[in-house]
Amino acid sequence: LPYRERKVKILNGLHTMSVLAGYNAGFKIVRDMINDKAFKAYIDKGLNEEIIKTIDLDENELKAFANSVIERFNNPFIDHKLLDISLNSVAKFKARCLCSLLDYYNKFGKIPSVLSFSFAALINFYENFENKDYPVNDVESVLHFFKTKHNDIVFDVLANVGFWGEDLTKIDGLYKKVKAYFDDIKSLGISKAMEKLLDE
């Protein structure tokens, strides 16, 4: 059902791809995030160069739909709080973003950058959450996993079959890319790491 796929990958996927990075970059609501130049470029790149390329519908129609979604994000009368949208983000990432990431890999034989960065941003948001100044709301099994000590959190998240239904470390190049972005986020902060991604 391509139209359902369009909604999940573009409308829902866009939220999940951006909100955790957005919150950790200091934004509180979707509209402020989407009006930031770097985030807008990040979202456009993820949409046009990655997500849309995996959906079997007319590209112009998909871009029109994507633009209508971004306009909705920009609605001055609705304050979509990023933390509200962050609820259960692990399951949401699987349903909304991982499908695009894997479809892209299967179609083009390479790992998509923005979707991998958003994966790294997800891990950064959850990692060591008990010592952070924001609430992380997810199911107990997810919270328990992130409370546990990990020598390599990126590897362990990707290898968690319970989260993803498969061991993602077996996808050639995915671990290396997500780990590189995660390390950039840790050393540079989200905004600078994102600028580096956009310069690739």
Predicted feature descriptions by range:
Residues L1-E200:
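Non-transmembrane, aqueous-exposed alpha-helical and coiled segments at domain scale
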